[in-house]
Amino acid sequence: MPAMVEKGPEVSGKRRGRNNAAASASAAAASAAASAACASPAATAASGAAASSASAAAASAAAAPNNGQNKSLAAAAPNGNSSSNSWEEGSSGSSSDEEHGGGGMRVGPQYQAVVPDFDPAKLARRSQERDNLGMLVWSPNQNLSEAKLDEYIAIAKEKHGYNMEQALGMLFWHKHNIEKSLADLPNFTPFPDEWTVEDKVLFEQAFSFHGKTFHRIQQMLPDKSIASLVKFYYSWKKTRTKTSVMDRHARKQKREREESEDELEEANGNNPIDIEVDQNKESKKEVPPTETVPQVKKEKHSTQAKNRAKRKPPKGMFLSQEDVEAVSANATAATTVLRQLDMELVSVKRQIQNIKQTNSALKEKLDGGIEPYRLPEVIQKCNARWTTEEQLLAVQAIRKYGRDFQAISDVIGNKSVVQVKNFFVNYRRRFNIDEVLQEWEAEHGKEETNGPSNQKPVKSPDNSIKMPEEEDEAPVLDVRYASAS
């Protein structure tokens, strides 16, 4: 049979003119192969060689004008048949573009990004939260002894002019390393005019005692130079009548005295003393204006009251005369006393920090509540039947609590108050409960014999209801006189 040639499909409208030579060459090769099939074996071999050369020439002729764009593939089958497939590279790009939509714009909500609405209030709140974030400047360390810490603070104050808070902040910055902190102290200049509330109160108190004698004031504020005291005095002098702590305290005391006097007058009412005072006032009004003695006395009293109010320290500050005399007596003694007080203040602040740290740790542990640490409650159901152990336990509870049925019920655990009362009635004779109660009354007195006032009296033995287990159980020996017999 003649060999069948499979021709690859062509795309219509693309390169038909160029493929005419390849088609004619393929047809010639096919006719040569058909004629060779009917000839002798020798002729068949010759014609096969000619056909193969013709097909090779056709392939080269087809590839030359197309510049490598068209390709021919021939494969020999096991039975001698051959097949060829041809395809074009130019058509592959167009088909892929058609499959993927041509690479155009993608329209639709699924291709768009979701942009949140602009909220200026939320933005301002976030910026405010960032601004309000605090920074930790000091935290105590257990590995650092108090003696080393006091020595470090003294060096920072005397040599470099740091106050206690600044020195501790530097130490915390270097992770509680004293050597690094001491080496870094000269590299910074502390703010010299930083006046805390305590410093301002001490200055006002010292100024009320010593006036403008600044070297005396410096004895109460040893970490301040005289130049700093003078500078603060002139800035404090301008606003003294408005913002002075001592003046506010004096005005407050004066207002409290006036209110107390008004309350006393309202409480007394129109009594004979008020009438006499009113008469005295009228008589004073009748005095000629030349006599101004009472007015002078009032002015003297008012000035004395003002002086007394100014001499008193502000609220929360206590000064004794001995301490003031010790500070004012000698400069060295004043420095020693103030240094001791400063050390005490440092130790107290350190204790406060340790307590705060301990409290914060305990609060972190209690974030989940106390339920994990609570012991499981054993809930026992009430049982109407009395075992031997429960009977003995009830008798011992009666010996201790008397007629307190609630306490006896709590001791037993699985018996209610009503069941305890029934036990009193049903087992009175068996356990000699009357004698046990008499012993309890003799020990605690007769005032508590009736038990709590909200409990009802126990029924008499005549009206008692016998429990079924009383008939079934064997007689039990007396608890107080238990013997082998």
UniProtKB/Swiss-Prot annotation:
Residues 278-288 have a biased composition (Basic and acidic residues). Residues 103-189 form the ELM2 domain. Residues 190-241, 381-432 form the SANT domain. PROSITE patterns: ELM2, SANT. It is found in: Nucleus. Ubiquitously expressed. Residues 78-257 are annotated as: Interaction with HDAC1. GO terms for molecular function: chromatin binding; enzyme binding; transcription corepressor activity. Phosphorylated by HSV-1 protein kinases in case of infection. Transmembrane segments: none annotated. Changing residue 111 to A: Reduces BCR(KBTBD4)-mediated proteasomal degradation. Residues 296-384 are annotated as: Interaction with KDM1A. There is a cross-link at residues 122, 297, 466 (Glycyl lysine isopeptide (Lys-Gly) (interchain with G-Cter in SUMO2)). Pfam families: ELM2, Myb_DNA-binding, REST_helical. CDD domains: SANT. Residues 244-273, 334-369 form a coiled coil. GO terms for cellular component: DNA repair complex; histone deacetylase complex; histone methyltransferase complex; nucleoplasm; nucleus; transcription regulator complex; transcription repressor complex. GO terms for biological process: chromatin organization; erythrocyte differentiation; negative regulation of DNA-templated transcription; negative regulation of gene expression; positive regulation of megakaryocyte differentiation; regulation of transcription by RNA polymerase II. Belongs to the CoREST family. Essential component of the BHC complex, a corepressor complex that represses transcription of neuron-specific genes in non-neuronal cells. The BHC complex is recruited at RE1/NRSE sites by REST and acts by deacetylating and demethylating specific sites on histones, thereby acting as a chromatin modifier. In the BHC complex, it serves as a molecular beacon for the recruitment of molecular machinery, including MeCP2 and SUV39H1, that imposes silencing across a chromosomal interval. Interacts directly with GFI1 and GFI1B in a RCOR/GFI/KDM1A/HDAC complex. Interacts with INMS1. Component of a BHC histone deacetylase complex that contains HDAC1, HDAC2, HMG20B/BRAF35, KDM1A, RCOR1/CoREST and PHF21A/BHC80. The BHC complex may also contain ZMYM2, ZNF217, ZMYM3, GSE1 and GTF2I. Interacts with REST. Interacts with the SMARCE1/BAF57, suggesting that the BHC complex may recruit the ATP-dependent chromatin-remodeling SWI-SNF complex. Interacts with SOX2. (Microbial infection) Interacts with herpes virus HSV-1 ICP0 protein; the interaction leads to the disruption of the BHC complex, thereby preventing the BHC complex from repressing transcription of viral genes. The SANT domains may bridge the nucleosomal substrates and the demethylase KDM1A. This is REST corepressor 1. The gene is RCOR1.
